[in-house]
């Protein structure tokens, strides 16, 4: 039998496919063996002596069906698992996923002014310290912290208002006490004693002069 390796290689080059896709008509092997140029191969392709095989179709319907079932949790029992738990899903990957979710939530809350930069830093360090196991716990902690801060602020405002009220009451009492002391025991304002006039000296009697003896 005549070798048709050259013709198959040229046909694959002309039809731009692999050599496995080339079909040579076995009844026309004598004519095909005479073709030793690309031009002759093109003529044989045009005549139908050389054909490009159709692409085989591999159905993925079963694969899609299995994927949907696995998404529901089917076919994932102990008998279907190969590899340790760490090999199937490393704890580091779980950690990175959780950190990214929680940090993304904190960044979103900070940008929307739901938390200030101080609470952001505090919660960020708690996330790093593995305090929150999921996003729901972090959100609950943020709401609880905000409510506690609002409560502390309300109590502080009430305390300051009470202090101001007590201070005003003390000032009023002090003013009334000063006023009572100024009025005196009789209830009326005590008269201010006028300064006594200066005493005038009494007139002295004239002493008679003695006559001198001459």
From Swiss-Prot:
Residues 144-163 have a biased composition (Basic and acidic residues). SUPFAM superfamilies: Ribosomal protein L19 (L19e). Residues 60-83, 164-175 have a biased composition (Basic residues). GO terms for cellular component: cytosol; cytosolic large ribosomal subunit; cytosolic ribosome; extracellular region; nucleolus; plasmodesma. It comes from the Eukaryota. Residues 60-85, 144-214 are annotated as: Disordered. GO terms for biological process: translation. Keywords: Ribonucleoprotein, Ribosomal protein. GO terms for molecular function: mRNA binding; structural constituent of ribosome. Residues 189-207 have a biased composition (Low complexity). Belongs to the eukaryotic ribosomal protein eL19 family. This is Large ribosomal subunit protein eL19x. It comes from Arabidopsis thaliana. The gene is RPL19A.
């Amino acid at each position: 039998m005549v070798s048709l390796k050259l013709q198959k290689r040229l046909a694959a080059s002309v039809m731009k496919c692999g050599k496995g896709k080339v079909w040579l008509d076995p009844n026309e092997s004598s004519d095909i063996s005479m073709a030793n140029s690309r031009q002759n191969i093109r003529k044989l392709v045009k005549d139908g002596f050389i054909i490009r095989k159709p692409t085989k179709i591999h159905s993925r319907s079963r694969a899609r069906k299995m994927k949907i079932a696995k998404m529901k949790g089917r076919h994932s029992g102990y008998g279907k698992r190969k590899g340790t738990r760490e090999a199937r899903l490393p704890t580091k990957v779980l950690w990175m996923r959780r950190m990214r979710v929680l940090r993304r939530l904190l960044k979103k809350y900070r940008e929307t002014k739901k938390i200030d930069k101080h609470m952001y830093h505090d919660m960020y360090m708690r996330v790093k310290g593995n305090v929150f196991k999921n996003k729901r716990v972090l959100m609950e902690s943020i709401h609880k912290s905000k409510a506690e801060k609002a409560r502390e602020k309300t109590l502080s405002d009430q305390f300051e208002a009470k202090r101001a009220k007590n201070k005003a009451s003390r000032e009023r009492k002090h003013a009334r006490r000063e006023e009572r002391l100024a009025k005196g025991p009789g209830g009326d304002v005590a008269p201010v004693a006028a300064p006594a006039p200066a005493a005038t000296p009494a007139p002295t009697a004239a002493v008679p002069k003695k006559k001198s003896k001459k």
